[in-house]
Amino acid sequence: MYKIAVIGAGQLGSRHLQGLKLSKLKSDIWVVDNNPNSLQIAQQRYEEGEVNSNQTIYYIQLIDQLPAELDLVVIATSSKPRLTILKSLLAKVKVVNIILEKFLFTGLADYDEAAQLLQINHVNAWVNCPRRLFGFYAEIDSMIDKQKPLVMEYADSNWGLCCNSIHMIDIFMMLSGEKAYIADFSGIIPQVKDSRRNGYIEFDGIVNVSTPNGSTLRLTCVDDDTVQHQMTIINGSYHIIINEPEGFMSVDGNKQPVHIKYQSQLTGVVAEDRK
């Protein structure tokens, strides 16, 4: 029996749970949240649609109620308590695989501490960047000539530059085939904004990313609703435009639909891959 825990049953955690429901794995799943209302919503969402007879779900409020060993843990809380939760989890439970939601942590020192914890406890860890699982990005990846530089740009209004840049950087790194990059934050506007998530902050401006082979990524976030979502990718003779909200991409002027997968469609696939 595959043993899974989802810690944090809010908006995103409940979607992870829905995604796990699609898995064919015979599994016991523990959903952890100290807020009983969140657990109730997660349960309601899980119970929508057909029953998965391969799964048994437990809704609990404390990490101490988890079993001694888990094959996979998804930590889907907000970033502020995440390190504390990770420490509490690994102090009690032997974990094989962990998926961490971004933004990972709120302090620079937290990253080193978390890395040490994961290494000491021999845990495999991933940050959830789901675009790698979108079929059309895999199609684009097959078109890219990794021997030639990739030029990628993404611009939109109020898209959460701090919180969401990791998604664009991750898919850029996949497409470029590179393992390292340098980020230039000199284009950030030095004015703090309130994030859509209460208690967090954001910035507008430009982030420039470059790799050793000459590939570049330019991320632009502005407080101007007239600026609309657009991603462009240039590599060799290819000129690709992607518009995720409208569900299409254009390759050298040839427009075609693309399918954007939700988290509720993905986590089960990831769980099976980690098996």
What are these regions (language model features)?
Residues 1-51:
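N-terminal Rossmann-like dinucleotide-binding module
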Residues 14, 18-22, 44, 87, ...:
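Short, well-ordered alpha-helices that flank and scaffold nucleotide-derived cofactor binding pockets
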Residues 153-227:
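Rossmann-like dinucleotide-binding domain that binds NAD(P)(H)
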Residues 48, 54-117:
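Beta-loop-alpha module in the N-terminal Rossmann-like domain of NAD(P)-dependent dehydrogenases
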Residues 63-64, 72-75, 104-169:
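A contiguous active-site-proximal alpha/beta segment in oxidoreductase catalytic domains
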Residues 26, 93-97, 121-123:
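A short helix->loop->beta-strand "cap" motif at the edges of active sites that frequently abuts
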Residues 213-274:
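NAD(P)-dinucleotide binding in Rossmann-like oxidoreductases
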Residues 3-5, 28-30, 97, 126, ...:
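A structural signal for isolated positions on well-ordered beta-strands in alpha/beta enzyme cores
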